[in-house]
Amino acid sequence: MQSSRGARAADVPVRLVVDIGNTSTTLAIFTGDEEPSVESVPSALFADSSTMREVFGNMARKHGEPQAIAICSVVPSATAVGSALLESLFSVPVLTICCKLRFPFRLDYATPHTFGADRLALCAWSRHLFSEKPVIAVDIGTAITFDVLDTVGNYRGGLIMPGIDMMAGALHSRTAQLPQVRIDRPESLLGRSTTECIKSGVFWGVVKQIGGLVDAIRGDLVRDFGESTVEVIVTGGNSRIIVPEIGPVSVIDELAVLRGSDLLLRMNMP
């Protein structure tokens, strides 16, 4: 892995970022410094090349053909398929977000090849936003991840735990009678039916886990490294329902991984 904190990001008029997740894939067109134009499709669609050609073609007709493309993927089987498809469509090399790139932070990790592309992108964007402050980056998605950077941009470590839907799904799939429940904010702490009890248990359990871990990490940064102000950035599909319950957060941005991928794309262009 490389660190290049002073590296400049290239200015490319039209850039495409494809964020391939376990459930859904988000496509973002970045034009200059404007807010990206974003669309989402089921990740399973990557098995249908004709449909994806149509999706990418429509985006290109609407926004112009991309001059630079990045894939941020946590699904290895879809990474190669997506990269080949995009290169054949636009005749542009596709950058895959991985540990071999230049970063605005220093990744000190025992197994860098296992560090998820989404986590790399989120760390990059977190460092970009808070270049001289420690930051806790939390992604509340299929899995919930925590990654920590110190004041000078050193990676201090992280945590990974099951996400909301994974917890609810496990209760259903690993038991004989518990139903599958869609999790949203319960009306009260205690449930009065099995469905309500599952919803309350998963939702408030995740809230307390995330809030407690953020507080514990903040305490470690203050005690062990002498940090004073610790920033917290939160992203992920379930971030909006959780963040109001967990205390002070510096930034909530569901597009943070896309923005970080775009930053890394511009930093790593030849």
Curated annotation (Swiss-Prot):
Pathway: Cofactor biosynthesis; coenzyme A biosynthesis; CoA from (R)-pantothenate: step 1/5. It catalyses: (R)-pantothenate + ATP = (R)-4'-phosphopantothenate + ADP + H(+). Its EC number is 2.7.1.33. One of its GO terms (molecular function) is pantothenate kinase activity. Keywords: ATP-binding, Coenzyme A biosynthesis, Cytoplasm, Kinase, Metal-binding, Nucleotide-binding, Potassium, Transferase. ATP binds at D19, I20, G21, N22, T23, S24, T25, T26, T142. The active site is at D118. GO terms for cellular component: cytoplasm. GO terms for biological process: coenzyme A biosynthetic process. It holds the Pfam family Pan_kinase. Catalyzes the phosphorylation of pantothenate (Pan), the first step in CoA biosynthesis. PANTHER family: TYPE III PANTOTHENATE KINASE (PTHR34265:SF1). This is Type III pantothenate kinase. It comes from Chlorobaculum tepidum (strain ATCC 49652 / DSM 12025 / NBRC 103806 / TLS). The gene is coaX.
